[in-house]
Amino acid sequence: MKGKPVLTQVSAEMMGQIVESVFVTMMNLEVFPSQDPWAPSNDQLTSAVHLSGEWNGAVLLECNRWQACRFAGRFLSMDPPESVNDDVRDVLGELTNMIGGNMKSAVTTGLTLSMPCVTDGSDYGLRVCGSEVQDRLGFECVEGPFWVTLLAVAPSRLTGSRLRN
């Protein structure tokens, strides 16, 4: 039985459709592509999930703290928390997990998706070894701009490590 063909590139169009679908379905929040430039901020939260298997990479969702609180309020159908708490982190992680999960099912069979992790602030470095930014998509909604970044590991980088040879 043949599985899905391995896609080595996930199109920006596909990622945009996935993000739009997740935000509308889970928060009744329309999002639109934006050209706002990405820049690290001390006020940002970054959520990440990693995909591994026949295709390897990660999906990052980045927004400011205020937005994350607003997203949590919408997602949980409650007043938004006044500050970042575990509910806010859980919602941001779940949104990223849903984006990654939708991407996982569109790419190939046999991929695993990590648990989401959420980082607060910008004084850190996130490195998925061997990966490069494939796409960084900006979005706009009533809560302001946010970004989704797709990191992809080139297949040659998976076998080319001197540590594994």
Language model: regions and residue ranges:
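N-terminal auxiliary interaction/assembly segments of multi-subunit proteins
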Residues: 1-165
